From Swiss-Prot:
Fe cation binds at residues 293, 295, 388. The record marks 179, 236, 282, 296, 402 as: Histone H3 binding. It comes from Arabidopsis thaliana. Zn(2+) 2 binds at residues 514, 516, 519, 534. This is Lysine-specific demethylase JMJ13. Its EC number is 1.14.11.-. InterPro entries: JmjC_dom, JmjN, Znf_C5HC2.
Amino acid sequence: MAERRICLSKEAKDGLEFLKRKKLQKMRSDSVNETVGFSTMARSGGDALRPTSASCGMRLRVTSSDTVSKVHGASTVRGGLMKEKVEKLETDDLKWTERLPECPVYRPTKEEFEDPLTYLQKIFPEASKYGICKIVSPLTATVPAGAVLMKEKSNFKFTTRVQPLRLAEWDSDDKVTFFMSGRTYTFRDYEKMANKVFARRYCSGGSLPDSFLEKEFWKEIACGKTETVEYACDVDGSAFSSAPGDPLGSSKWNLNKVSRLPKSTLRLLETSIPGVTEPMLYIGMLFSMFAWHVEDHYLYSINYQHCGASKTWYGIPGSAALKFEKVVKECVYNDDILSTNGEDGAFDVLLGKTTIFPPKTLLDHNVPVYKAVQKPGEFVVTFPRAYHAGFSHGFNCGEAVNFAMGDWFPFGAIASCRYAHLNRVPLLPHEELICKEAMLLNSSSKSENLDLTPTELSGQRSIKTAFVHLIRFLHLARWSLMKSGLCTGLVSNTYGTIVCSLCKRDCYLAFINCECYSHPVCLRHDVKKLDLPCGTTHTLYLRDNIEDMEAAAMKFEKEDGVSDLITTDEDLYKYPSSITLPAAKEDGYTPYSTIYFDFYTEVEMTSHDQLQSGNPVMSYEANASCISSVADDYECSDYVNRRANCSSSSDSKLSEEVACSSSKKTRFFPVVQDEQLVADQESDGSDSECFRVKRRSSLKFENRTVVLDTRESDHHQELKRLKKSHHHEGRYSSSSSVSRQEEEEDELVISNRKETQQQSDVKMQKKRIENHFGGFKRLKVKGLIKP
């Protein structure tokens, strides 16, 4: 149907021609068993469009043409095993669309609508069982979205992404990918184009029944003639009006405000993340779609429909997420497309947000699926770990953002474990969020908790339980590290959140670093097995207020409900631990006991210019800080005795004696050195309607001033320098010691030359390291543990 084809970019046109040539070559080459592949929109502008693309959609394989009518599915041999795949989509029988139950619909009053997170906590026990729910707003926007985008936002334009409308095969034979971008539009130009496409297809400018368009969509996906559609996803911005007279824009349901509300955990992030803490726009047309996916870190999402045609949603309850992934793994993907075995294999591919297949496949395997038809003025909320997908019935404009509450932490812990298993860099500092929320709860008064609802109390217990598990594990890991005798130094951790160089888990409370500062490692790894190129010096970085946190954890353990959860819940914060941790009271270990690290150390303080980062795209978004100042040159090589005592007692303090007059504190955010990993991570997104969200390349980091905390050296160090000065004066005042003085001066010159050469070597080594600190004095601790 040439009259419905969209004017595509040259890149997209070349891509489609490439697909046609490949399809023709495959048809000619398959002389015995011809494989018919149907291309699908399973990606948004990130992957190649091939008839059998490994990056697009559902697995659908049928045999030669003379047996197509007899075969409803197919099997494929992988390693001698036969695996049943997704059956051929029967377009003559789409009655399954009528069997899908509706998700719950809520119509709050204006009073109930006052606070979105309070209302969501109220409906959570029921709505979360469906994975998604719909909320009809009692408030109406007086300023239309079109007016906001055309008038309030000057020069608002966006570039679409080209989506193919076909089903595809999922195997390793077709991994050619390329980015297919569409045209750049104004809001009105895109609306005209989308409405023109709809009118040409149905000879109507009005809306059609939702059930009819749902069947039309799956027919088009299976065997339609429309090759592509254009979808504007991940568009920075918001269509909520800033006019004070707009009721909806002035309310807390304005998505610009949701993630920063008092009950949202994401308010604790120091830097905004587009699509997560800041909303994004999704401007669609007939049959533009968002593939099956789950939110980053299993976050909540809230989506508002500003204007236009309806949108159909399919949702899976979070409790059925593993069952969903199992069906996808066994019935959609081939084994050779999976990056890993087990349940995480399908999860890894689904993270690309490039897979679309009919819900009938899930119904046939007893996976619960619920449907929602969203209209303008309605919100759709997806709950933690709820997979969802959907498509548009015509031109429309939606907006979405993420948020999290206390009940999210158990889901976030699972997501962090799975990311570590797949060696994926996290988007959020999960450990830091736990600690901050827990310490806020610890400081709150009992009177503040008197009027809490059961759901709110449950959320608080989730936070406290997660916090206790984390603190208990880190205490045990530190005790094991102390017993090993392999820790050569202890430093106050003031760097915020860093990422483990081995498993990519985020570290906020404690981590181990090497001599060159470029290999931070979390405490889940065995120090004995570390093979670092810079040697075997391992310094433990520990947060200053660890004692306060341990005291808070001990307090939480005594509360009703929390102690029960601690004994029954799985401790997810140990994963992927490679160290053998003793059980309680084994080898003398007691939870929350005092841990002593005794060192005899040589402390050197040096300064280095800030190095140029090779690729800062994966610096931790939650605490991105830039330091451009360079510390003054300054050296010191006095020997000091240093004893760091880490305990849970209130009078114990993390202390260190450093032979320097001052030190500066800042944050450290290591850069991921694996370029391929960074490329893979670029596809991550948080919104329910994005394909290939290059969030990290479009992050708008807020410039924040980092206060450099200068600590004065203690009086003991001044006395040492005075004593040393007087000692030298006494030695060199005698005239009979002139020759000896000259010899010592020569030795000092030689020593200075050696020291200068060593510093030069260190500087050259550090210039080759992308993952670094820059612009502040560094503490190098060398020495042996005292027997």
